[in-house]
Amino acid sequence: RTLVILDEVHHGGDALSWGDALREAYEHAERRLSLTGTPFRSDTAPIPFVRYEPDAAGVRVSKADYTYGYGRALRDGVVRPVLFLSYAGSMRWQDQHGEEMSAGLGEDNTKDITAQAWRTALDPEGEWMQQVLRAADQRLTEVRRDVPDAGGLVIATDHEAARGYAALLEHLTGVRPALILSDDKGASDRISSFSESDERWMVAVRMVSEGVDVPRLAVGVYATSSSTPLFFAQAIGRFVRARRRGETATVFLPTVPKLTALAHALELERDHALDRRADADAEQGDGMTEDERLMAEAEAEDRASEELTGYKFRAISSEAQFDKVLYDGGDFGYAAEVGSLEELEYLGLPGILDHDEVAAVLEQRAAKQSRIRDARGRGALDDGHRTVEPVHRSLKEQRTLLNSLVGLYARQTGQAHGQVHSELRRSCGGPAVAQATAHQIQQRIDMVRRRLH
């Protein structure tokens, strides 16, 4: 009589031969216990010994005999509540055609524009990363008032970015952070050393995922272009392990729709689907999401077109803006300038809060932020900051508004619609309306409004 225990069984689908070998070795075992903290994959390779049943849409999904998810563990005090501090901002870059582009991270833009704005935000040379790392370090200082050995982790896309982020943190804190690179033979020892110390920061290239245990990590910066649900869940899993009741975790991330959707769905239980759902955000057969595919294609196109045009993608400038706090499926707070009193209200949240206290405290901070905004609007508060108004109009609505205004102006002047659009494009810069960002369309809306009046 044999009991076989398979831990992290989702890896059994990593290759056909791997899965076949597992089946051949253990198919006739009397009992099998399959365990995993992430019971899904970024592809459709079946996981050995897992039962799949069709859902309402006919998609075959995995079925567990027993599930203990994040939501239940949170209520039991086994894991920490995670607050996501989302940052938007203004981005400018040169595309592979030599066209200078600008867009707001968090605006309703096309997916390729969002991917390029996201890429610009993650540039170590830009202000966005400097401002977000500074905010994250302030948050870590606040958490360490209650949890003296709390540590922070920056998750980078590649080695070059990781080195850049490490240099930024050294400049901000005066202390060089632990740098973990996948090709470094001493990486595992360095992670263990960091785990046992009270150092503030560690920077790693994606490799800090499952199997890496650093319980004191309490603040994270998600500075990678990866947006697969599996990687996101494993990355956030580095911050949720509770050592004592009341510890919280804070993760800073860019306001990218795919990431904010994953943050909102943190407490939802996911299963592995053997069939692809027909939606735009589904992961592709190679495990990449549409956002990641666009990012990769943009980088490949940049390299190919450089020889033909002499241009390549170049981040020009970036500036961060506090957007909101995401917690327990809800949004808290309002857009605010970096360094403002409103942002500090959230960076200064206590490091020790029970799950049922977090939402109440966030609501109190949002109400206080509203009072600060009102006081600034009345002129009763002059703190050197302006009140940031969020963008409510969608890209489709902006295009519709621009076309309506162009129609009005064309009737007034007798010009053709196309002629007016061409003049606006020459005056404001940027590509045709179909490829223009929300910010570029807004500039044209503002100009045609001035002409109408």
Regions found by a protein language model. Name each.
Residues R1-S34, T38-R41:
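SF2 helicase catalytic motif II
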Residues V4, S17, A21-H28, P48, ...:
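Alpha-helical scaffold elements adjacent to nucleotide-binding pockets in ATP/GTP-utilizing enzyme cores
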Residues T44-D149:
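Interdomain helical connector at the RecA1-RecA2 junction of SF1/SF2 helicase-like NTPases
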Residues L122-P124, W128-A135, R139, K258-L408:
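Long, largely alpha-helical accessory region at the distal end of helicase-like NTP-driven motors
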Residues A150-T157:
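Conserved RecA-like ASCE P-loop NTPase motor core of nucleic-acid helicases/translocases
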Residues T157-L181:
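Conserved helicase motor "Helicase C" RecA-like lobe of SF1/SF2 P-loop NTPases
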Residues R176-G285:
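Conserved RecA-like P-loop NTPase helicase motor core
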Residues R378-H453:
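Positively charged, phosphate-engaging catalytic surfaces used for nucleic-acid and nucleotide handling
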